[in-house]
Amino acid sequence: NSVNPCCDPQTCKPIEGKHCISGPCCENCYFLRSGTICQRARGDGNNDYCTGITPDCPRNRYN
């Protein structure tokens, strides 16, 4: 197993000063900027965007 550079192996939480370990809105241990597309629209839906405060990709409320 490779060690995740964002993760404190003792606590399984982000290393001090880092924001996140993984997720569609996490890159190199930091949250992606608000407004970054994390899921492109399919069909008649709308794109989903990162919030800048979580590693998750929330569903667009207009979908």
UniProtKB/Swiss-Prot annotation:
The keyword Transferase does not apply. It is found in: Secreted. One of its GO terms (cellular component) is extracellular region. Residues 1-63 form the Disintegrin domain. The keyword Aminoacyl-tRNA synthetase does not apply. GO terms for molecular function: toxin activity. Expressed by the venom gland. It holds the Pfam family Disintegrin. A motif (Cell attachment site) lies at residues 42-44. Disulfide bonds join C6-C29, C20-C26, C25-C50, C38-C57. It comes from the Eukaryota. Keywords: Cell adhesion impairing toxin, Disulfide bond, Hemostasis impairing toxin, Platelet aggregation inhibiting toxin, Secreted, Toxin. PROSITE patterns: DISINTEGRIN_1 (PS00427), DISINTEGRIN_2 (PS50214). Transmembrane segments: none annotated. SMART domains: DISIN (SM00050). Gene3D superfamilies: Disintegrin domain. Belongs to the disintegrin family. Dimeric disintegrin subfamily. May bind to both alpha-IIb/beta-3 (ITGA2B/ITGB3) and alpha-V/beta-3 (ITGAV/ITGB3) integrins, and may inhibit platelet aggregation. Heterodimer with subunit A; disulfide-linked. This is Disintegrin schistatin-like subunit B. It comes from Echis carinatus (Saw-scaled viper). The lineage of its organism: Eukaryota, Metazoa, Chordata, Craniata, Vertebrata.
